Amino acid sequence: FPTEESTLKEHQTDVVIACFGMGESFDGEAGLANFKTDLKAFVASHKGKQYNGESEVRLILVSPIAYEDLGELTPKVASRNRDLKRYTQAMKTVAAREKIPFVDLYEPSKALMAISESNPLTTNGIHLSGYGYWAVSRILYDRFIENVPGNKKWQLTIDAKAKKGEGDGLSVSKISSSRRAISFQVTEESSPSLAPPTDRELPAALAQRRDSMTVKNLQPGKY
């Protein structure tokens, strides 16, 4: 790893996704000015560079998640989240001035953490759990891919009696059914999503993004 620039050129980098703010936020309000200065310098160091030899590298800034309240394990939750919110806002301001994309993970993660009976997103308030990685990856995917054609969740409906089906995000054909089996063929029109690593009920904001399949008018029996 000789230098950052030489490594990015070696990899012919097209996009740099830069996550800042969690560690820096421990400097509190007093560290905000330096944080903004350093962030502007980081952006300036990459702007205009053609690491792939053809096009200017694209920068995306990503904020930290919120600090999760896990009881005695996570003291000073209110003050930590005040600082994290300040640093998230600072990143948003710099991104707007530099005209580069910005993804706010603080607000959506805080909203998920506030839901009672929800799965914990972190193991210690900061580091994501397996479920947390799944949930945050959904947020990132939606922000990165929003408004792109084909960015649809899979919704498949099969009418076993009529042998008809319809889909969103995929197309369905060759439907057949009997007392023991139902079969059909699907063609992907968008990417499938990974199942959550939990059997517990998901918050509505995440549940509505799940792929789903509904089979109607299925005769009783084992299939």
Regions found by a protein language model. Name each.
Residues P2, E29-T37, A78-R86, I126-A135:
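Soluble non-cytosolic domains of exported or imported proteins
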